[in-house]
Amino acid sequence: MQNYGAFSHAKTTAHIDFDAITEIFTQTHNDGRASLYEHEVYRVMESIGSETPPQVKLIPRGTRPSDDELMSIPGKKVVLKIVSPTIVHKTEVGGVRIVECEPSKIRSAWRRMMYEVPEKYARWIERHADASPKEYAGLSGTALEEAISMDLKGVLLVQFMPPDSDTFGNELIVGIRRTREFGMVLSAGLGGTDAELYAERFKKSQAIVAASTKLTDGETFFSHFRQTISFEKLAGRTRGQERIVSDDQLLECFDACILLANYYSPTNPDAPFIIDEFEINPFAFTDFLMVPLDGLCRFSLPQKTVTPRPVAKIKKLLHPDTIGIIGVSASRENFGRIILHNILAEGFPKEQVRIVREGCDEIDGVRCIPSVSTEGKLDMLVVAVPAKHIPAVVDEVIQKDAANSVMLIAGGLGETQDSHERAQQVIAKINKAHESDDGGPVFIGANCMGIVSRPGGYNTWFIPENKFPQNGLGTPRRAALVSQSGAFMLFGLSRYPHLSPNYMISMGNQTDLTLGDMVTYLKDDDNVDVIAVYAEGFNDLDGLAFCRSVREAVLAGKEVVFYKAGRTPEGKSATSGHTASLAGDYMVAESCVRQAGAVVAQTVEQFQDLFVLAETLHSKRVDGNRLGAISGAGFEAVSMADSIDVGTFTMKLAPFSEKAASGMRTLLKEKHLESLVTVSNPMDVTPAGDDELHVELAKIMLDEPTVDAVVLALTPLSPMMQSLDTDRGDPFSMHNETSILTRVLELAKQSNKPLVCASDGGMLFEPMREALNKAGVPVFQTADRAVAALARYVQSRLHAKSIRCGGCGIR
């Protein structure tokens, strides 16, 4: 049997009776249902090792139970719960009653529920039509009540097990959910009927945490859970609260859920069923026992999986020896012609390029051929024809094995409902080709703006050269920018021309190659240390593949910067549990990618800032969170101190040793500033501080063992600073040998710690900022932004370091 834990080293204490659980699913499936009743969920709980599921007895609709049957549940009180395949949230519709354990009281409550529940549920559905179960579509009034009533299977008698405490935070929700992008996801946090409210109101990851079950184990998930308010309450860490559950119990619960999820998972080829949702809400606690008080489970049959794409062929896409282009006009500057010009302008050999065009000998000195298969197999084929012609081109390329990789430029292939059918036809052809012995060609796009590959020596963006971002003139850096949106990449590089990645890759619609595929390739590319990814959505299970590759990239010493667009809350269905709302799609994506080791940006601005820092500081050592800060303006010093806390992480203002402080005082005395400037952190050197003082103070801080990074805020408006783009020899010229620019560049080369600059002051001083950025010293417009960006970057570096120290590899 496979190991269904996420890690080969996982210490799992849980024992799962998979045969018993599969039998429960089989019986339910044969009964025509795709969801378990509550008492069946408790049977699953017993099969995964739960110690204390409550005793239950189903009273089927239409039966006349005896007094003995009604009194079969121990205790002075008993809980009555309505049983229906369409009612999940029973409390909201009057489907839960607690009564004295007496036959007459039970019968009265039971009969009342059989009438009142349909009435209340019907009113709820009429108020929430969008969340109505499909079984009741189009029904209202009496017809709706009757349909609901017909679905009532009876009432479940449940053992009443009062918790030790009913105060806030003493209930726990634990849920498994099958997600389209990340597969099986485990979540846990504050439970009960107000679980969604807690998740909405509390800070991120305070009420609930989530993780992919293939990317974690019980111990790792428990370490995340320990950061929540839920754990604080359960562990008795709040005033007046006593511990009500042991760490081992929680760990065993998480272990069992991970094993359960990974067995009944779409990633398990042997899975007899797939769990779509499994939830216990809540677990209550009595005398150090975890008591499940309600549960749901939905499941489905396994679906056929798609043949993996031959990711190794991405090498031919990024490093082609031969390039073909379809769609080049001989008479005008269309997209194909612009792409041709950009390929040649980047220096790709003209004799290695072919234009696919009948009736034409050459265009711009490049030879034309009548079809894609005329002169053997191409490494890369750029298809710049309208979308309606793409299916025929794809057919020809596949049938004649004409190319190793294909770039689909045109849109109109899946973005709209009208183009959906055409897209599905193309996808089916490509997937079929991947079943061949060599895997067939790989396709990037459609709706792809192109690729700039410095190592491959080409540029296929359809942007005219005179409108192209000027970063093309800069020295390539060991980074890759992968963007689902070409426009996002283009606009970002226009705003940040000092960004200069080796690869700039527009993924488009992910008709074939995915974000996960590209990171899988780039994690092993020797030209890349930093991978920045802008994502709008993942293909089926590609989020999981993406995270696995992120983790492997991090373990290999690389950095991954990630931004996910689209945070709209998912629609809520009456037949879904709380888990889907608590751990929504964006929250799951952010959690999984962050836990894999990437730094996750919350805004586009953060993404660009973090990419700049990763590109320029990757080779620097980051050993801690102790910051040294220098400014020539008092307000900047204050703003830097105010910016060290970024919510999930805090930089510390480093203390200075007596040796360092003495060196600083000596510098101040030499500059006759000892009566004006105090040694502190942040250090305000006032506008009287010259270029030398700024840099020498920064050098002392960088040499100080108690400092891990330095932010140096320049004051270009100061009369003491050489900050203008004037001729050398001018007293304010940044080109002088004693200028702040010259000194900072030399200091950055000497130090192995991060040095980040800030330079306010408007466009007059843009040349100095640009010179620093171009030389690899990151510069921000404001000091507070510099500190906040550095804090997030340091957090990610320390997180990645902890992952590498753990040495855990994802299967």
Which positions does each model-derived feature cover?
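Catalytic-core regions of core metabolic enzymes
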Residues: M1-R811
